[in-house]
Amino acid sequence: MAENLACGETSESWIIDNDDDDINYGGGFTNEIDYNHQLFAKDDNFGGNGSIPMMGSSSSSLSEDRIKEMLVREIEFCPGTDYVKRLLSGDLDLSVRNQALDWILKVCAHYHFGHLCICLSMNYLDRFLTSYELPKDKDWAAQLLAVSCLSLASKMEETDVPHIVDLQVEDPKFVFEAKTIKRMELLVVTTLNWRLQALTPFSFIDYFVDKISGHVSENLIYRSSRFILNTTKAIEFLDFRPSEIAAAAAVSVSISGETECIDEEKALSSLIYVKQERVKRCLNLMRSLTGEENVRGTSLSQEQARVAVRAVPASPVGVLEATCLSYRSEERTVESCTNSSQSSPDNNNNNNNSNKRRRKQ
């Protein structure tokens, strides 16, 4: 049963004040933020037009100098170096991240949001939790953060974005008013220093696939995307840079090959701008999580095969989220990742619960 939290009920909290005059209730902070795939305000300029290459652009459009610049800048969009250690030690509540990711995946599948929207949402959430501690006595704070991160990511990446309140589907425990979400959005963007068009593994995947395989195809990108999306679940991947995850994903699909297999050592040797040993460690972690056969592309589980069949019709982007969702926590994981695996979502009672929401007075 979801609780609808009105703005006034949280007036004593860190996120709300009583002056709502400065809130834009329409499309966000439109005077300060351009949601058309441009960098946010402040001083976060990147290159000539301020944009950062995202997945889908031709790898030939990225010069070697541009790639080098991206490799230097990517660390600015990573969580703190002690973030994973704090999650594993209990200093930060791992369940906050797990629950947020579970809900974000379900909402992205519901609205057919793209793979990059998932990646950006979690990038914002992880970077925020690095710098800002949520109040432990507010059960709703984690859900509000998840809604705000997804809202910001969808405005950055999607062309058809539902109203901010309508994002709260898939039976969330709490439901928030628009002005409450917008205040949290403002806290997120200021905490992240307005740097929201982040460099992610998807920013590099075309380049590395082309570098290793000599060409970029939809099939190679699709298969690489599966591995990248799956890395969002295991927090150990947060110790790797986005470029290293992208390189490992590119190697994993190239060594199975579309027409001929590329030797793993040969594939790794073609990676001149990243540390090959770290890429190999990342690749081995992918194998541990999903199984040697899946990383080598030689077989798929029954569930993965079922999802792959659904890739043929209308929405290939939506299938990527479904593929990510197909990796359940019961699949083989490395021992150290046990606590970061997700329970599979249970949607059986969604329709029954959707009409049970009440407003908390």
Curated annotation (Swiss-Prot):
Q: What is this protein called?
A: Cyclin-D2-1
Spell out the family assignment given in the record's similarity comment: Belongs to the cyclin family. Cyclin D subfamily.
Q: Subunit arrangement?
A: Interacts with KRP1/ICK1 and with the C-terminal domain of CDKA-1.
Family matches, as PANTHER family:
CYCLINS
- Organism in which the protein naturally occurs: Arabidopsis thaliana (Mouse-ear cress)
Q: Which UniProt keywords apply?
A: Cell cycle, Cell division, Cyclin
Role of this protein: Acts on the G1 phase of the cell cycle to control cell division rate in both shoot and root meristems. The complex formed with CDKA-1 phosphorylates plant retinoblastoma protein.
**BP terms from Gene Ontology:** cell division
Low complexity bias: start-end ranges = 339-354
Identify the tissues in which this protein is expressed: Expressed in roots and leaves.
**Triggers of expression:** By sucrose and glucose.
Segments carrying the region annotation (Disordered) are: 335-361
